[in-house]
Amino acid sequence: MKVILLKDVPKIGKKGEIKEVSDGYARNYLIPRGLAREYTKGLEKAIEHEKEMERRKKEREKEESERILKELKKRTHVIKAKAGEAGKIFGAVTAATLAEEISKLTGLSLDKKWFKLDKPIKEIGKYSVEVILPGGVRDTIEIRVEREE
């Protein structure tokens, strides 16, 4: 029996693929669990349309990510933090802090998950921070942590 997979199925195939499986396997396992549907031309066209829409969505997401990254790379971002005389910050600058402060500076809506820090920043200085945006867009931006007056 020919089926169209609705989800990835180990050892069978990926979502949207058309596969030939035994009738019993399809009727007793794949179809009841919502993993596949019986193949029809109409269903195939619907799945192809869905794949095309998903591809376009990813393309738009990547373009938006590239635009955001271009905006972020325009300048060195200055983050103000309370610090002692030795340059040690009270607390730390984390990815969440970066997202919040850079959002205020640029007007962009940023997610803390996009900023990759090996460990929180605990001293005043200049740092390179890796930014990983949706769509696989990644680069580094410069930030400078300064003492808050």
UniProtKB/Swiss-Prot annotation:
The yes or no answer to whether the keyword rRNA-binding is present is yes
A Pfam family (short name) is Ribosomal_L9_N
An example of a GO molecular function for this protein is: structural constituent of ribosome
Does this entry carry the keyword Ribosomal protein? yes
SUPFAM superfamilies, sorted? L9 N-domain-like (SSF55658), Ribosomal protein L9 C-domain (SSF55653)
Entry's InterPro entries? Ribosomal_bL9, Ribosomal_bL9/RNase_H1_N, Ribosomal_bL9_bac/chp, Ribosomal_bL9_C, Ribosomal_bL9_C_sf, Ribosomal_bL9_N, Ribosomal_bL9_N_sf
Record GO biological process:
translation
The family note in this entry says:
Belongs to the bacterial ribosomal protein bL9 family.
Instruction: Spell out the protein name for this chain.
Output: Large ribosomal subunit protein bL9
Q: Which gene encodes it?
A: rplI
